[in-house]
């Protein structure tokens, strides 16, 4: 799912994104994909249809939103499209 989302995001004008890598050198709880879209900070936590966020992931998502960024749990490319469409005014 992450690969398909990144492939899509790389085609979106005014969107710069990257995959945040976990593991021992990553920061726990940081969403999977980070973007700058039309100058706005956007973070996507990617989950399967049955996947659930952890308490730490929810906390990070809430912090991003409180700081004025956009953060969302997505399960498909269509979910990402919806988030980006809602951001464009």
Go through each PLM region and give its residues.
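Catalytic phosphate/metal-binding cores of nucleic-acid and nucleotide-processing enzymes, i.e., regions
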Residues: 1-89
């Amino acid at each position: 799912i992450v690969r398909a989302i990144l492939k899509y995001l790389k085609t979106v004008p005014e969107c710069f994104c990257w995959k945040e890598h976990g593991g021992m050198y990553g920061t726990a709880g940081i969403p999977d994909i980070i973007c700058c879209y039309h100058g706005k900070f956007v973070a996507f936590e990617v989950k399967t249809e049955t996947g659930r966020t952890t308490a730490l992931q929810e906390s990070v998502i809430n912090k991003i939103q409180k700081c004025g960024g956009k953060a969302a749990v997505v399960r498909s490319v269509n979910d990402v499209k919806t988030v980006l469409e809602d951001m464009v005014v």
